[in-house]
Amino acid sequence: MKVDTKEVNPAFQSIIQNPGQKVFLDANFFIPPDRSEVAKVRAYSFTDFKECWLIPLLSEFTGLAIHESVYDEFVADSVKEYADEQTSCIPSKLRIHYDSELSGLEEALRNTYINKIAVHSLYNPTRDNAKDRGEVRSLSFMAVKQFLYFAANDALPVRLIKDAAKLLTGLDDMQ
């Protein structure tokens, strides 16, 4: 991974300066890294991952959110249970956004975004397959609601946002 130490990322700087801004997270933010097969090391437990990553993250940044399609990607019960705890605590530390929140006009707009974005992914809206569904549906929802920030450790959403003008995804204002 290449890290630019000369230029400050304006989106990151904005979020650090105002940690209450709405930031959508991809599922990979909630899944412990597992390099046990590659490096012959013990897999990172969810308990340890939660302690050193999720608790500090959700404590410091109060505007964190996920789309329902990302929530559906959580396979491990421990991850879903933790997300449920964070959405139901007072004050809530995580918000789940649902497509049911959209008006009829917003649904039509979301479908347009889905079709524009899906052609650059492995997601097929007709089949509603799992591959890239979370990213495509999250970004589409965000575009309709004009949310700016999506955090992921995945090349697809980064490319869809960074190259929005060239790919004609309609995500030009996102970071």
Region spans (language model):
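Active-site-proximal, substrate-binding regions of enzyme catalytic domains
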Residues: 2-146, 155-175
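Conserved SAM-binding loop
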Residues: 150-151
